Amino acid sequence: MARFRGSITKVSRRLGVALAPKAEKYLGRRAYAPGQHGQSRKGKISEYALQLREKQKMKYIYGVLERQFRNYYKKAVSQRGVTGENLVKLLECRFDNVVFRAGFSPSRAGARQLVSHCHLRINGNKVNIPSYQVKPGDVIDFREKSRNMDAVRNSLNKTPDSRIPQWIQVDKANMKAVFLNVPERADIQEPYNEQLVVELYSK
């Protein structure tokens, strides 16, 4: 499946938020848009531009391209409840995102690689689809030959327990995680406003 391969740091500077952990230190040093006129860009932002920016934030944070993102929106509309919250929950339940949240990888891009390269299982079955929707009660663990990966061990060791969300139970010693429940919107601390995205698609 196609995915973004450009500089996430440049995109973060353009949108004004850190879209990945590695972009945080660069954004702190250069908190303005890239390019020759990045520091001088001022002026009132239109409503459409604000809505578009929020959509871009969500797409880049979760590593989703336009067609797939639009499909998530359509599914969110068809579900009961608040459309924006449904959209966030669908994105948070992606397999690669849950792997990232569990601390198995320091980034969603790295988590996507772990999934795509068949290192992980769900309920004992090999799953290599990053967009797979993880369900409450699902157990995620590593295949036997993948359990001694230094990169994963290092990521787990560097991930404080306080960073692991309450809806995921992680057994670091056995490199295993249990997806306890779908998170509520209030539990998601990401720098986007999904309601503006809903307004954009509702036009």
Curated annotation (Swiss-Prot):
GO biological process: ribosomal small subunit biogenesis; translation
Superkingdom, taxonomy of origin: Bacteria
GO molecular function, one term: structural constituent of ribosome
Entries under Gene3D superfamilies matching the protein: Ribosomal Protein S4 Delta 41, Chain A, domain 1 (1.10.1050.10), RNA-binding S4 domain (3.10.290.10)
GO CC entries: small ribosomal subunit
Ribosomal protein found in the keyword field: yes
Descriptive protein name: Small ribosomal subunit protein uS4
